[in-house]
């Protein structure tokens, strides 16, 4: 594919009051203990792989994918992350698009890797737009999708070139792509009248976050043969790696036909190109980019106990707290506690650490009514609840996915920016007496966001734009 997306492009979100002195590419000590430094995970059971081939394959995909697709010759890293949108600009699914090892300009060959939960919908979307294009589409059932990471890698290992630099990934990439080269140039072994499978079918750098990892498509059950030296990992460890990196993925975190591309951080993860030609869903996306305000974003979060110190720069996994949490928190509300009567001193932003811990409460008081000590019930005094000026907690978003006390949430950043000394929490299931419980929460910048000062300036500009818009609306209403 003829696309050149800079791997280390600086990305700036709608900002918040965050210290600009924080380190980059820092990983939590507690989370390190659960995620191996080097790992290999098989994603085949959660993914669908569709092979799109034929003379018009690039033309078809170029009109549907959020990044440009070229019919040019394949290179070792000629694959990209992007999305397919519907006509209203909503995300059908995020996806990885590989140029396969046997791709040529005359016989184009691509593989789409995406969430298995939206398989039928995306296949219908592709067939609806195929019309008379010379394209063949089929599911790959005898291949596996492998993700490999090395958290000790440096940028020198990951330059987006036709070959890897020296270091850990040099041997990995050389083995992977040289195997594909041998498969193409050696004598074809006939087996039951069909050519033997090439050991490597697709390879790309997962550049949603710098140094995140590489993805490849191999014939089934061959990854252990070629990459046996890399420790095997599980899907939970892969998801936790994504949580700390702030990279949403799949239908749980990017709901089909509901999520908007920039609310889903596709622009931060190199998944959008605002300078390319037309594709389905482009109009709303481009208009939002140039004239609109992105009020929601998906961000990592950490739940922590009353009086506990959360991670300063990124979420920390707490096994003890995670074991005590209800099993299903997906969909739970993220709320502001600023309306609570208890005295609390917190940082000026949900992205900063608390300046002062809340006063500790006795175990007896905290566990009264069967409520665990880490889940403090909201006080609902009848006299106070009838006060006319007493505001209620404001819903700011909801949890999309989580593992224990860490995960991803979709939140209203515009409301968070408007509140000073904001205190955030996540609502838990009601207690035995019907009381509403909550657990403290902290939100984090995705770690690929490096220019905090520019992000803050962008946020202030968006708030000013919203203020001017309201004034104009008010004036027009008086005329």
UniProtKB/Swiss-Prot annotation:
A GO cellular-component term linked to this record: mitochondrial matrix
Transit peptide: 1-99
GO annotation terms (biological process): iron-sulfur cluster assembly
GO molecular-function term, one example from the UniProt record: transferase activity
Location of the region described as Disordered in the Swiss-Prot/TrEMBL record: 341-395
Extent of Basic and acidic residues compositional bias: 353-364
Subcellular location: Mitochondrion matrix
Protein name: Iron-sulfur cluster assembly factor IBA57 homolog, mitochondrial
